[in-house]
Amino acid sequence: MSIVTPYIPREYLALRINYCKQQLAELPNVVRSERNIRGEKKTVLVSESHCYSLNSTSGRKLAEVIQRRELLSCKLSRLEGLWNSAFRGLPPADIEPRKIIRSFVDSTGESVIIDGKFFESLKHNSNPYYPEHKTHYYNGTYYRSAAEADIARFYTEQGIPFKYEPEIWISGMSRPIYSDFVILIRELDLCKFHEHFGLKNSADYTRKTSTTYNNYSGAGLLPELDVFYTYDVDNIPFDIRTLHTKLNSVIYDSLFGVDITL
């Protein structure tokens, strides 16, 4: 049995590395130091030439900064190791974290920006229809297929926030839609809609797929930019590398495809 070569998403990996570097640069410098206080040695935290007790409010906040710096440094080291194993040189500097503005028109005619605030407003697993079809369990949620459970596992392991089947009202609809997945790309403060289609040989399902595509487009969400699609193949397990390639593509197009940054 041959070993499947993993797909490493170049642009998305570069974005994650540069985001880690940006976050580290924004943190204040804090160091632990031993000081003689009233004849007794005590550990204090020093930041911007000021000393803070570990038990003070400021000291506890600075201790959290130290912990966050350590976590980010470990994450950066891991991501850079992955980069060096696959690519030459440094991650491109032009793949930089920044806020990208995309929006859709909701059922009231208002424009809704699909950013972190929108993501937080969504309720995870809110589709009330056909609960009996949710038979595949992962991490506290039942999914409608093994492929959807694998997708949820992928997003969880990659540290990508997602909501499964949240209720969303879009233009032209008399009832809400329930996207399979809405994910948040923190590095761009930008949401993406992910629809996973199965039952490709079913005529009814094919019509549903076409309707879903048209509904998103009618609300101003562009295919393969705001919304991306994955598909089941008969008698073949879903290849998660497909998701890597799709993610990399929509992120690349968000960064360089159109002038939509803020």
Residue ranges: model-predicted function:
Residues 1-118:
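Nuclease-adjacent, charged terminal/linker segments that flank catalytic cores
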Residues 5-8, 67, 139-143, 200-204:
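Conserved aromatic-histidine-acidic binding/catalytic patches
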Residues 97-160:
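Solvent-exposed, charged helical/coil patches
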Residues 135, 178, 182-212:
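Short beta-strand-loop-alpha-helix junction that forms the active-site gateway
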Residues 141-143, 156, 161-187:
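Active-site metal-binding core of divalent-cation-utilizing nuclease and nuclease-like domains
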Residues 155-156, 213-217:
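Class I S-adenosyl-L-methionine
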Residues 168-176, 202-204, 233-239:
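Acidic-and-aromatic substrate-binding clefts and catalytic sites of carbohydrate-active enzymes
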Residues 218-262:
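Basic, glycine-rich
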